[in-house]
Amino acid sequence: ERAYSMASYPAEGRDIMLNVRIATPPYDRKANDWMDVNPGIASSYIFSRKPGDKVTISGPYGEFFINESDAEMLYVGGGAGMAPMRSHLYHLFRTLKTGRKITFWYGGRSRKELFYLDHFYKLEKDFPNFKFYVALSDPLEEDNWKVKKDLNSEGDGFIGFIHNCVIDHYLNDHESPEDIEWYFCGPPLMNQAVQKMGEDFGIPDENIRFDDFGG
């Protein structure tokens, strides 16, 4: 069994959208070859299915729910952690038409790891209370990444680990970060860093929610 977060939101009906990246063996830079380990079992199985094949799923599980309040919301995502971000934010804006102030920070190593960007730029255009920011931790030369100097400057996004970008470009200048509700999902190291960031900024436990998909 493997746990996958849903990218779909309730208004999309019975269609279930998952973001699955096939887990290839790690690359051994010293040997200049792939490590001799098996690829991901569940992701390999999913990628081997054809349209019309039947599979068995169960759920949903977990407690990654939206708090019912008027507080500002901060979303932080990385990698395949994009899935529940889309689900939450589409429900908040497309269904609830929320007036809450919301920012979403999404990080990847290079541009090729980013996806759904057009979805969130469209939300940003449609809802003035929503802002979307992107950061790359290790941009490639071919990314031609145009670095933003601050929140309001032109550019593609920031450079650095996403939690550091949130601190440097948002939280350090925020009047009351302790009043923000935090929602996050990403690789284990990112989750740990964002969890600590919340503690450092005095966020109450009940206002910190994350989706752990077993990474």
Question: Model-flagged regions — what are they?
Answer:
Residues 53-55:
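Structural motif
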Residues 65, 84, 193-197:
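Phosphate- and divalent-cation-binding pockets in alpha/beta enzyme and binding domains
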Residues 100-215:
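Reductase modules of NAD(P)H-dependent flavoproteins
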